[in-house]
Amino acid sequence: MRVDLTITNLSEIVSPKGKPPVCGKNMSQLSIRKNKNIAIKDGKIVYIGSEIPPALRTINANGAIALPGLVDPHTHIPFTGNRAHEFIMRLHGKSYMEIMQAGGGILSTVKAVRKASLKELVLRGAYALNEMLKLGVTTVEGKSGYGLEKTAEIKQLKALKLLNKVQLVDVIPTFLGAHALPEEFEDKKEYLNYLSNMLKDVREYTDTVDIFCEKGVFEVEESREFLERAKAMGFRLRLHADELAPSGAGKLAVELGAVSADHLISADDETLEAISKSATTAVILPGTSFFLKERFARGRKMIDLGSAVALASDFNPGSCNIYDPYLIMHLAVTRCGLEIEEAVTAYTINAAHILNLSNRKGKIEEGYDADIVLLGLNSYTEIPYMFSRITVVSVIKSGRVVFHES
């Protein structure tokens, strides 16, 4: 069989094991194939082994390691504007909620996004996605939530749909209209009813709804009513949960069968135990804790309880202006207690599971999409040690070499 591409001279081919989502102690189990080759045809991995099938193109990896293309399941692309001044405010002691209540935070980005054209959102988003691709991130979730009214929310969702067409990273959209209470509304219930009426229009762009369920934003009972409406319409559910305080949002995610509960920095033991016994994946975002100088989610406890854990960047203009996956993995290992094997599983197959893509992304296996990143390391175990200067040798997306260091 003649293939499109072969990758030879790989020191390690690293891939998660097990049926997704991979839970608890199984997250530390990786398939490590040493000194094997990969063959790709029609955008799919068709062979992994010692042979070198004839190919239209061959890459000599020169001892690099291969990981599945990384999957970032929680970002706030697309957005525009700059909130560097808020970073300085936080250094001077202002809290996230204090900045938000003063008209900064999410609402300042809302003003910028409402003014921006669709073209500007697409161009800004494409730039960020291209930079992420160079780091080996091949699939990214993006959210609305910086519009907070119908026209601007749909504009963000249109931008995500266009981004999925005009650049190489796969972009998976989520509706996060319930990100904050806009200035036009005084009553949260009234605003959530407004969003509920938008859902029929949103369905054209996404099958997933998210909400910022937090004390002072949308409380548990308010969130439950909105999410139940979305669920009744067939939407998959996600929650920003227990980020700033233990609010009950993580338990609500379990109750409603949400795909994920994200952040969980302030989740109590009872909440973590409930998540571990459910089908809800815990998403930890250590970059946000790092950026805000806050405590970190208890990733070690989540895994020890048996949860499926995913990692994500939370890339956004205010609380985490970071999209580097190797920094995120470093923080997961050094601050959240994960083993590097668990971090790899969390940023690949478990992340893909959240986006309903784990049947074709997040593993280097025959039949999976040929999304692969080659790193100039001796072993995957060097990722948290070398995180600030990892050489990305090549990125393969859908069987095409889309980035090469030379």
Swiss-Prot record:
Cofactor: Zn(2+); Fe(3+)
Keywords of the record: Cytoplasm, Histidine metabolism, Hydrolase, Iron, Metal-binding, Zinc
Broad enzyme group: hydrolase
Cofactor note: Binds 1 zinc or iron ion per subunit.
Example of a GO cellular component annotation carried by this entry: cytoplasm
Coiled-coil blocks: none
Matching SUPFAM superfamilies: Composite domain of metallo-dependent hydrolases, Metallo-dependent hydrolases
Superkingdom of source: Bacteria
Binding-site residues for Zn(2+), renumbered to this chain: H74, H76, H240, D314
Gene Ontology annotations of biological process type: L-histidine catabolic process to glutamate and formamide; L-histidine catabolic process to glutamate and formate
GO molecular function: imidazolonepropionase activity; iron ion binding; zinc ion binding
Positions annotated to bind 4-imidazolone-5-propanoate: R83, Y146, H179, E243, S319
Broad class of the protein's primary localization: cytoplasm
Residues annotated to bind N-formimidoyl-L-glutamate: Y146, N316, G318
Compartments, record wording: Cytoplasm
Pathway: Amino-acid degradation; L-histidine degradation into L-glutamate; N-formimidoyl-L-glutamate from L-histidine: step 3/3
Enzyme Commission number(s): 3.5.2.7
Functional description taken from the UniProt entry: Catalyzes the hydrolytic cleavage of the carbon-nitrogen bond in imidazolone-5-propanoate to yield N-formimidoyl-L-glutamate. It is the third step in the universal histidine degradation pathway.
Family of the protein in this entry: Belongs to the metallo-dependent hydrolases superfamily. HutI family.
Entry protein name: Imidazolonepropionase
This protein's encoding gene: hutI
